[in-house]
Amino acid sequence: MNNNYESHAISRRSFLKASGVVGAAGILAACGGNSGSSSTAASSGATSAPNTTGATPLKEFISWESTNRELESWNMLYSQMASDMNVTTNLWEGLLSFDCYGKAVPSVAKEWSHNEDSSVWTFNLRDDVDWVDVNGEVKAHLTSKDFLVGLEWVLNAAKNQANNTSMPNETLVGAADYYQKTSDMGDAAADLTYEDMLAAGVGVEATDDYTLVFTCKNPCPYFDTVAAYTSFYPVSEDLITELGIEGFRACDYTNMWYNGPYVVEEFISQNTKSYIPNPNYFGADDVSRFDRFTVTMISDGTVTFQLYQNRELDEMDVGESTLTTIQADPNSEYNQQLCEKRPKKFSYQMHFNYQKNNEDGTPDDNWNKAIANTAFRQCFYKGLELTNWYARTNKINPLKCENDYYTMPGVCYNTKGEEYTTLVAKEMGFDKESYDGKTMIRLRSNNGDIADLKKQAMDELSAIGVTFPVHAAYYIIAGNSTALDSATVLKQCFTDSFGDDFIVLDIKTFVSSLTQEVRNPQLQSFVINGWGADFGDPINFVGQEILHDDNAYYSWYYSNIAKIVEAGPADWQKDLVAAYEEFTDLVNTAKAIVDDTDARYAAFAKAEASMLNNVLDCPCYFEVAWTLTHANEYSKINAMYGPCNYKAVNWETSEEAYTTEQYEEFAAAFDAATQA
């Protein structure tokens, strides 16, 4: 067994019944050779977990994470990394949480409302929430003041170092000004308190111990999804006083205070982390919890299947090689247990670099001229057949991974209940199309035939000195065989779709940092990257691509189009810049509509369609993987934004692995409930 799984001591807390020396395998042995003791209630507390199959549920559960995604910060207010929040969401609660349909549900806030134009939002808090230490002992009572303290911490540059400021700065009256004030003050700002924030006019107030009122700059009908993010989480002033500014910023599980469903039982970096129920959790009667939830860190994916077979994991993602192994044996019990997961919340796109450099630092004008040409870019969207590449993620149903839009489906709905990307589909003429398992939706209108576009692009580009084939540099991390295999398949997709006389994919490698070695020196032709929403509005996606905005992440750091505009475009870039200006104007027009949600989303759909028709970047895929599991994925939190998806509450589980048939029933029931 890999040395990440060697035995180690686990120290039980005083309120647990058992103690002993166990490892990932030892936990199983202590429980009779499986991942958890079975009982009629799969949770700690009065609420039973959902059970739609009559199965024997699990009281303990072992999940996994890759070692390259180990937690780096325990501070929910400070961290901006999903890998951190996947842990701390189990320990730290904010105003709202979410359910398995992605709907906001009460957490510390028991109810919330807004005024007529959605510019003022009121959150009524529970009066039974306590802060506890790692031993589950009560340290303080939580009131509305703790949310004021938390927000001041986030907005204070001397305390939180600018992390997680964008959402309050964009939405709340006075927030950006207060942040700038603290930035200008330097270290002296560390002495400011929430009272200074209120005196500065930031749009938040605690009208009593259990009522919070936020005032937005403009009507903001989606503010509840903003307030669910970590920027608005609470912290006790007493804890900050106890630890000090530096100490709280760097707090860990041993000295932080908890108000979430679990406390940390044990943490061994790059090995395991385990949570046990918070004995003073305010929601103990509202949600089900495990008696122990363990996350095992995996450095080598080749051992995952063995761990699952040994019941040292209760769930695993099934990669292409494992899937091939299972399907090659018709007698394997696992053939009937392969379950397809829901898409993860990230929309992946091919982000073109319009200002590429050669490795010697000189401009790669052959690529730069080519990618600035509209017909050349349209060949990607209308002609790149990716089914074989999708099969690297989902071998059985590869086209489930097809992504034709920029925004992730499910982020927001209009007042008619129409999901936002269906509005984009109408603008693109795809609204009558649906998944058929055979052909990519966006290639159907022309059957993937780009002969005319290819000729147009080659004629126009040859006239300005471009030579063919155009070479596209695609970087992967060195020494990773999985990444190399996927890139090799993608290279063949380029050959089959474009022809090697037109575009050739060159696979290149970096040692450790894509940002430092590739993106900063601008060596890539494109990067495939995913974006997940922080809140429920299209601006969270399309706003990353516009011009004339310092916060447009992709425009500055991936496509470099903002730098081109800042310096002044070349003649051969003027059509590209014009397309970006049109898109930017459409986004800003949509953003300005703050009193009509339907009109706002319709306007954003037109903007997104403009981006797609001009292929300013190219949507690629969704992560839709297969799993072997003892947990019903459809019972887990499934929000398209916020930090809560890895919170281990209300999970339906089974001592016996779920079957393919059961998962198909789960999916059908979920889809029916969603539509209803």
What is the role of each PLM region?
Residues 269, 307, 397-398, 434-533, ...:
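Ligand/substrate-recognition segments at binding pockets and active sites
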Residues 110-175, 213, 304-307, 366-372, ...:
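Aromatic- and charge-enriched surface segment that lines or borders ligand/interaction sites
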Residues 186-191, 198-201, 207-210, 215-294, ...:
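Gly/Pro-rich hinge or "lid" segments in bacterial periplasmic/extracellular proteins
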